[in-house]
Amino acid sequence: MSYEVKVEDVEYLRHGNTPYLATIYRPQGSGPFPIMVELHGGAWCRSDRHGDKVIHEALAKSGVIVATLDWRQPPTAPYPASFQDIHYGIRWIKSRAAELGGRADMVGSMGNSSGGHQAMLLAMRPFDPRYSALPLPGAPALDATVRGVIMTSPVIDPLGRYRYAKDLKAKGGPTPVNPDELIPCHDAYWKTEEAMDEGAPASALERGEKVQLPPVLYLQGTDDGAHPRPHLDRFVAAYRKAGGVVDLELFEGEGQGFIMRKVGSPNSTRALEMIIEFTHKQIR
């Protein structure tokens, strides 16, 4: 079944005189519909909520309420500012779930690249006081727990990717990514290597940190030079060892961002189908 979708922009948060918007995709029907909070990529320091529109529309047409967020970014707002805004955004969407046609207990999160990292780490640490620092007026009891997480080519190891980019720059020559774009974003957002490691999901698991373990769908291309395969393998092994469930799908020959860059291709279509199927299975 394909639903008609209503789209609206709503201010969900304000810092000083700066509003931060959510774009809400609402399937038109009786519901209740699952809700997916989607987080854009951009190495934590650029891009906005409109970057993954194809995914937003596909989910909404399948009967999912999608909320895609903007948040504070460097240079004015390093880690953990974006986590505070996203944490607030998840609670905010839960507070509006009924009027949107959903339920507060039917919420998941997903993200691409750095957005995937933020979705995963926040899902693991929904009760971290650093992240929950912004009070939500009228709904103090709501939390930011989610029923499932979808990651598409996440920066799952910030420190590992930082060192990978610095190594590429030192070697010179052609590179699969531009280290002169990545390195400054890591520096601006994280400030230190210690913070990058503290904010790495696999590191948290390996330290024995007590975390939440929602089910995960992890999608990535085998030729993705921006998100090294060893980082993926480390996280998946650590998450499964801790008792979490990860559905991992590797797309042969695909590079970074293939879902958006190759819309209509067999692999992009299959990835969208998997995202839709996982959402309806887990967020209910």
Residue spans of the language-model regions?
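Alpha/beta-hydrolase superfamily serine-hydrolase fold, recognizing
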Residues: M1-R284
